[in-house]
Amino acid sequence: MVKSYAPIQTYEAKQLSYDLLNNPKDFYKHNRRYATSFVLNVTYGKRAPIWECKEIADIYGCLSRFGRVRRPGSFIVDTFPSLANNPIYNMFSDWRRVGEDTFKKDSEVFMGFWNDTKERVKDGSAPHCFGKVFVQSDFEDQGLDELTCAYTWYTLPPRPVLSVSISDSFSGGFLEGGSETTSLTMNNCIVGMLSNPSVIQKAHEELDRVVGSSRTPTFEDEPNLPYLRQIIKETLRWRPINKLGANHYATQDDWYEGFFIPKGSIVMVNWWALHYDEKRWRDPEKFDPDRMEGRTMSAAEEAASGDPMDRSHFSYGGGRRICPGTFPQLYHLHSHPRAPPGSLSLLHFQNSANFLQGMHIAERSLFLNLSRLLWGFNIEHDKDSQGNIIPVDYTLETGIMPGGFTVPKPFAARITVRSPERAKILRQQWEVAQKTGVDFSDITFDKVGNVKM
């Protein structure tokens, strides 16, 4: 299932490399465009060929609103729900207005994608994508309305066994979350490598030895590029994707190391304490992929292990609210917290063939783009007109954007192609890709997402 997305990932990665050749100063935006275009392709069979397009503006508008409501301490009512009915608190807090405004604006975006997909399914122009399968499914028989489907963006499992109540997960699920998580990890990786330039040199040496200079890296090279995998693991340890992760809910009274946890308590995984534990990680604030040497399991294999010490990081979460993809018996249908009562948010199903393996897909995108970036380019600190190095803020205190995700503030870097020969290969790859389009599940569509008849 995961490998079926390879043509789309490869296609978008080729444009990313081409964009870096032509306009390297905008690498921050290029990484964001890649991630958004890929998930748009998978979910709705549409591309985001440039950063300045309506689809990206709509999605990042949703992300901005999500960041506001998800920012730690934004609304105390999240910690003390009883305040929702307190008239004095409601006089001075705009939490309800913000929530209703967010739901209204997000719904307009998501229903826009949903209705566009319905029209393309009707006229036969919709390529193979999850949105198409969802539109053609019997979602109404499953108790789902169109608004819930628009927030969900996953295929329905064939035989639902058990439904559970609405979860307070990411609104828009895969599309909204997938747009930012991959790009912020790539940009955090660049920040980390700038803080420790020896990492770039080691990666260049490994890629030159394994891949050479006459071709670009492919997914098949991954087992032979352990240092690249170490860089990805260290990035996710050094800068977790989400600042606080998903809330967990205690379904019964429990005790942990002498602490009583009442039923109904909100419990969160403190991955900052785990990732920066000096007993486990020497000099944890340093970006150092060498510490991941010998950790050969994939992120999903680590997460599925019964031993938490097997995990190199907890950026994908843990427990029943872990990132989709680890446990195939769980199928997440994320609905908005204000979706109509009774709409499904989590379905357990028997056939795992339709499971959207988000964690695996993210890992493959990170590997492909990082390997192509380091194969083709040098990465250095940028300099101003006087020749002075432009500093990059490596700190957590001031180097991260406000909001729920660990997004680095925009920063300067000097990205240059490693040789004219490599530039020629990267340029030719994108020229060919534009002519041939994307071949995905026996359906070929062009560079803007239209089906090629």
Regions flagged by a language model, labelled:
Residues 2-186:
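Cytochrome P450 heme-thiolate monooxygenase catalytic core
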Residues 10, 57-65, 125-134, 191-242, ...:
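Cytochrome P450 I-helix active-site segment
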Residues 153-155, 159, 171-172, 257, ...:
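Cytochrome P450 heme-thiolate "Cys pocket" and heme-binding signature region
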Residues 269-304, 339, 430-431:
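Conserved cytochrome P450 K-helix/beta-meander segment immediately N-terminal to the heme-binding cysteine loop
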Residues 294, 429-453:
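Short, cationic low-complexity segments
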Residues 181-199, 204-206, 327-333, 360-376:
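Cytochrome P450 catalytic-core helices
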Residues 203, 235, 261-264, 287, ...:
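Hydrophobic, well-ordered secondary-structure elements that form the walls
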